[in-house]
Amino acid sequence: MTQILLLLLSITMLSSQEKEYFQQEVNYQIDVSLNDEDHTLSAYEKIEYKNNSPDELTFIWFHIWPNAYKNDSTAYAKQAGPRSSFAKSDSLERGFIDSLDFKVNGKQVKWTLHPEWIDVVKIELNEVLKPGQTINIETPFFVKIPKVFSRLGHTGKHYEITQWYPKPAVYDSKGWHPMPYLNQGEFYSEFGTFDVKITLPKDYKVMATGDLVNGEEEYAWLKGLTAFTDSLNSLSKDELKKWIKKSQKTKSLENRPNARSSTFEFKTLHFRQTNVHDFAWFADKKWLVQKGELSLPSRPEPITLWSFYLPKNAELWRNSIEYLHDSGYWFSKYYGDYPYNHITAVDGDLSAGGGMEYPNITVIATMPSKHLLELVIMHEVGHNWFYGIIGSNERYHTWMDEGLNDYSNIRYWEDKYKGENERFVVLELVQDRLGIAKNMKYSWFSYLQYALSAKNKNVQPLNLKADEYTGANYGLNYSKTGVFTRFLHHYLGNEKMDEIMKAYYERWKYKHPYPEDFEMVFKDKTDKGLTWYFDGVFNTTNYIDFSIRKKGRTYLVSNHGTMSSPVEIVFYGKGQQEIERVWLENVENNAEIKSPEKALYAVIDPDEFMPDVKRENNSTKSSIRLHWVWDQPTYYDHDLNLTPWAKYNYYNGLTPGIMIYKGGPGFTGLTALEPMWDLNNEKLVGKIYKVFNYDENNLFGKSSLSIGAMRLHGTKSGNVKYSGSTNTKEVSTNFSFQLNHNSLNETAFDTSYYESGSRFIIAGIKCSLI
């Protein structure tokens, strides 16, 4: 009987917890006009605010984020710092919002600025807003659009109108969430419907969140413009470059900062979108326009794809519709179908990173390569799922959108470019033409971003607010979450991970999940212990470092890291034949595995899913791999990079040769041999050296030991040097100790100044406090 009562009590408690979830509904009507001579917006906003909470509300926090650009005292200005372009700008380049006059249900209300932030205001309600009640809030507002410093802004007559209107802060089960605008730190807003009318000069091309209402004429005009863009894309690469060069010779008068509007005719575009929590729009007269479609099995009508880009970037953006198509396709396949009617990318002048996402639309900064452009478009389109449809609190839990999106980016690249060995090209000249780093994968690129900082003593966990991170650590929300979730995917398997992530999407679309909600979906779908992921990855700075070595007929797996994650061991026989795969759980110190029959060697995580910070000790066998200059290493193999090398000095003259080295990003040291031929004296000269790097957890802090020998410049020498640094908030200490042994060639030096022979020399002992 007691057990039955406890069970009923548990069910009742769970039921009450489920009922605790609520979210407010906020619907907008905004009429806005753009003045492109003064770079201002004049607008009127009406908001329908429905209180779905169980609480009575006496006030509402509002964000008026254009005020972030008003002066040097805002949270944004302080975060940007004294060396930022904003700090060096004048008042004419800055922005603000004013002319606010809030009314609730037709009656004026009192409102005050937040005590710390001038871009947050508090509206005092004349009457208590009870659960289930709806009020109507309205206000005029005027925005001076700043120069592009962060997200909202203009460059000449190019406009990026984002975070531009007064919007209520989120009120959820954890209370109010007022927050100032920041560059490092994104957003959290209520879902609802946006009905926005934009009036501006007729010759602007405009794209925004939502669909045009009665927009047949505007859509027909845009579609007509695609014919010219299609004709450009039919040109050869050289012909297109000539056209771009020619188009850039004539400077557009309409884009000069103080130019008058090129037309006195205006148009009003009416956009509407349901189930979103933000609205952004972009306008430019010069954009080229491309259009495409994405068909999904469950949708009767295709999704329209729009790409708007500047003529100077025509060659780079010619495949942008493909990138939009593939992003929408793969994310829909992974999580659930895209629910809106268009996916759009616009070419921008963004200062807040490589791109920025908004519902239905993303703005992209200039990129150096096609792969990077595809990556950024795909990443920002992916935010329609993680931030857009699943509306987590980006400011408080950055990893929930950026990190899960980064994991999805890796998966996209692996699936789309599987036939090309998942190549990721950052610099086309270096990788495609010179053949350097030609086999670099995007998954390795993401791994490296995490691994290089994982053992840093100043590293921060992922459970902090965005503004609490240093600039270096903020990126871990992307890379660390991405690589560990990819590893979790490998551990659980494709089928199970897909089931879980699709369930997460269905359970939380158009809602505001927290980390515990994300974890609960996994608990509901798998009985595997995932504490190492949900606690170890997000709440600690623990890292993975396993090694393996052979002991007769057994293999010893050792944990040198601070995280006890699962670890996969793969055994191989003759001809690299795979014999068996074994997963070990919770290896805290050491574990022995009996060798399978015919197994000759074993490798930890040969497919490189596990974010082990030191992969050099992950195999009992090492092969020799030769690379031209440098390429992505395996770490545990002998990855030898061959680089043409030459030096010149008075005694030897020109000394051509080659550098053979092992090391680089992700290695704990460097080994190098530099054989060269002395053309003056016709003999072999060169250097050989080895560097051991120690991380900041070492006794002497971050340090290195180098040992080398050289025959060059008329000398034979040996050198041992130990140097390092220790850093605290109060003081930084740099130190070095160096011991040389030199043998001087009497024909290379003036004997009146130098004595030939060999001797030991203490070259330096140095210590400095900063």
Predicted segments with their positions:
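N-terminal, polar/Ser/Thr-rich
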Residues: M13-S42, T155, T531-W532, T643-W645
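Glycine/proline-rich low-complexity spacer/linker segments in large multi-domain proteins
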Residues: D72-S85, F142-F194, N214-E216, W221-L222, ...
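Short, hydrophobic/aromatic-enriched beta-strand segments in well-ordered soluble domains
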Residues: E45-I47, N51, I64-P66, Q133-K147, ...
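Hydrophobic helix-coil surface modules that form long, contiguous segments used
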Residues: P168-W176, G185-M378, Y407, G419
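A surface-exposed beta-strand-loop module
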Residues: K50, R83-K157, S247, L253-F264, ...
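Solvent-exposed beta-hairpin/edge-strand motifs
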Residues: F62-Q108, T199-Y204
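Outer-membrane beta-barrel initiation region
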Residues: W583-E585, I593-K598, D605-L699, N734, ...
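Hydrophobic alpha-helical and helix-loop surface patches within well-folded domains
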Residues: E25-V26, F271, P300-S558, S564, ...
